[in-house]
Amino acid sequence: MDVTRLLLATLLVFLCFFAAYSHLPPEEKLRDDRSLRSNSSVNLLDLPSVSIVALNKKSKKISRKEAEKKRSSKKEASKQKVARPRTPLSVPCVSTRGSCKPPAPACCHPCASCQCRFFRSACSCRVLNVNC
């Protein structure tokens, strides 16, 4: 009785392994170098060829010029943004990320609030809701 159960269990394991292994397509099966060399079904001529094209000096210069134009336009755009001076606020208030310990005035940003940490020893104005 024990021999029969052992034989049936072995047969069941073999059938499960065979069923799982047979569902793999032939390309995904594991192969070593020897089987690849001996197998004639894998033909290297069937693979698409790769063409390598060298860039000439003119195309390199054009791409460099384009890159320089992009860099200069980015620098000009950043200079234009920085050139705008901010109007000073006449109301006494604390800027964002500035220290706002309790005797200090309120935060300048309407959506900012004063948050304190470490038992109110370090306080700063922070914007909690970006979409405010």
Curated annotation (Swiss-Prot):
SMART domains linked to this entry: Agouti
Alphabetized Gene3D superfamilies for the sequence: Agouti domain (4.10.760.10)
Record has Transferase as a keyword: no
Xref: InterPro entries: Agouti, Agouti_dom, Agouti_dom_sf
Predominant location category: secreted
Composition bias type Basic and acidic residues, residue spans: 64-79
Signal peptide feature range: 1-22
Domain of life: Eukaryota
The keyword Disulfide bond is annotated on this UniProt entry: yes
Keywords assigned: Disulfide bond, Glycoprotein, Knottin, Secreted, Signal
Location relative to the cell: Secreted
Disulfide feature: C93-C108, C100-C114, C107-C125, C111-C132, C116-C123
Domain Agouti, chain residue ranges per copy: 93-132
Swiss-Prot/TrEMBL GO biological process terms: hormone-mediated signaling pathway; melanin biosynthetic process; melanosome organization
Comment, domains: The presence of a 'disulfide through disulfide knot' structurally defines this protein as a knottin.
Name under which the protein is recorded: Agouti-signaling protein
Organism: Callithrix jacchus
Gene name of the record: ASIP
